[in-house]
Curated annotation (Swiss-Prot):
Belongs to the bacterial ribosomal protein bL35 family. Signal peptide: none annotated. GO terms for biological process: translation. Residues 1-28 are annotated as: Disordered. SUPFAM superfamilies: L35p-like. This is Large ribosomal subunit protein bL35.
Length: 64
């Protein structure tokens, strides 16, 4: 039986925390930043957790 392969796009975008939650990077912080306020850009810098609704889909992509 072959090895189970992880989706490589998901592998690059998500990390597991020590408690088993899934971390993700915020979108909207790569370009077209001049119209966004400093506060908004600052809040986009921090990592966030994947929501409970999406967590099962992400776990399936990561095969965990």
């Amino acid at each position: 039986m072959p090895k189970v392969k992880t989706k490589s796009g998901a592998k690059k975008r998500f990390k597991l925390t020590g408690s088993g939650k899934i971390k993700r990077k915020s979108a909207y912080h790569s370009h077209i930043l001049t119209k966004k306020s400093t506060k908004r850009k600052r809040n986009l810098v921090h990592a966030h957790l994947v929501s409970a609704a999406d967590e099962s889909n992400v776990r399936a992509m990561l095969k965990i």
